[in-house]
Amino acid sequence: LFPACTSIGVLLAWGWEQWRGMGLRFITAMLAVLAMLVPWVLLRPAFASPHYPDALPRTATPVAVTFDEAITLLAYAAPQHDLHPGDTLPITFYWRAEQAPAQRYNVWVQLSPSDPTRRIAESHRWLGGTLYPGDLWRAGDVIRETCTRKLPTAMPAPGLYWVRLGLTDETGKRIPFGDAADMLSLGPWRVRAKSLPASPEHAVAYAVGEQIMLRGYTVTLRESLTVTLTWAARARPLQDYTVFVHLVGADGNIIAQHDGPPYQGNYPTSWWLPGDIIPDGHTLPISAPLPEGALLRVGMYDPITLSRLPVYDTHGTRLPDDIVPLVVSP
């Protein structure tokens, strides 16, 4: 090997020079490709004209709401499929200037359930962005603007969520539209859970109507009594139902009760899909200790006719008064 050291050294030096040359040529070629792609892939989309002179797409949902007699939201386009926590929801708004705006507006967009105060995501930006802000618009301009919202991975699901938006002036005051309203609601979108909820403490199996099963319940007693019912959808219910939860004593008299839509109204039964598991909490105003022999009576009814859904046990026997009896320890 020693006699070959000279040759090995020469060949290594020559190979190194060749490799360096190839590497430099490769880097130069990649930089040239990058320089050609950047204007089309990055710069052109970022600085594309927001003007939208063509007819609105057929997939857009009409809105036609005018703010401050100056700016009209003509329509919006958004995915119509179900979402999951962590997904991205892109919404494209189509605005029109009814007249040249006298000021620069800000647009706020939020994502929230049926209660708009419980927003889970929110953004504020100039209307039209920095490329073509609203105070530069001319009468008749139709502007396309896309807002992308990322759904939090820890958001409550399943449930219904709305996109709510509005305009504010330069002082932060909301701009009204219509009959003095200042917040526009779009949607809703159904957000389905990625995983099953925690298993209930007590497993049961009762059929409530033809589409719904009661799979279990959990009772928590602190300053009040919270009953979390676990519903399962066997098929899609035909309408919205109301849940009743009654706490009764050994004599059958009602001690406390709560009636309301499942999931605090954030996921009405008419939106349930086969396979959905819905944890449904109801709070009853009562403090410890519970009276001896207390029971829970649970069921569903039609809020219009007040007719209860029939309740059946695992043997197919219909229960008296269409009530599910649940044991609660004192």
What are these regions (language model features)?
Residues 38-330:
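C-terminal luminal/periplasmic domains and tails of membrane-associated envelope-modifying transferases
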Residues 16-44:
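Signature aromatic-anchored transmembrane alpha helix within multi-pass, membrane-resident enzymes
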Residues 1-16:
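Hydrophobic/aromatic-rich transmembrane helices and adjacent perimembrane loops
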